[in-house]
Amino acid sequence: MEKVKIGVIGCGTIGSVHTNAYAKVENAEVVALCDILPDRLGEKAKLHNVAKTYTDYNQLLADPEIEAVSVCVPNNMHAPIAIAALNAGKHVMLEKPMTLNPDLARDIIAARDASGKQLQMGMVWRQKDEAELVKEAIEAGR
């Protein structure tokens, strides 16, 4: 079975969780890491034995080897990075929350639809009160 080549954008705590999880998946391989902090990026690349590193996510997205990305950055950056990744032809695993407002969420969905790529949300706490409130707002069209 051929491995899916993955780039992880954001090397903080959540990015490390993703990188460690991918290491346990037989058909996945993290081939690139991206972080705006060069020291942290170098440390995580060495720890996870990842050769390709980027401090600019656009450079990672331009890498034709990368088929999918995990977006593990601060919440205010979820939408622009997810949209750029989908527009670059990458599948996207997007950490929660999807974004900070409904209009940006619609933009992400539109980018997904236009790209034909997969978008997966990391919503492991779907039953939390906050998630239920968001669900109710979406259903009410707000």
Tell me the role of every PLM-derived stretch.
Residues 1-48:
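N-terminal Rossmann-like dinucleotide-binding module
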Residues 99-142:
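A contiguous active-site-proximal alpha/beta segment in oxidoreductase catalytic domains
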Residues 10, 37, 56, 101-104, ...:
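Acidic/polar helix N-cap motif
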Residues 18, 51-108:
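Beta-loop-alpha module in the N-terminal Rossmann-like domain of NAD(P)-dependent dehydrogenases
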Residues 48, 88, 114-115:
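Helix C-cap/helix->beta junction micro-motif
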Residues 28, 67, 90, 117-118:
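Short, well-ordered coil/turn segments that N-cap beta-strands
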Residues 25, 48, 63-64, 128:
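Acidic-histidine catalytic/liganding microenvironments
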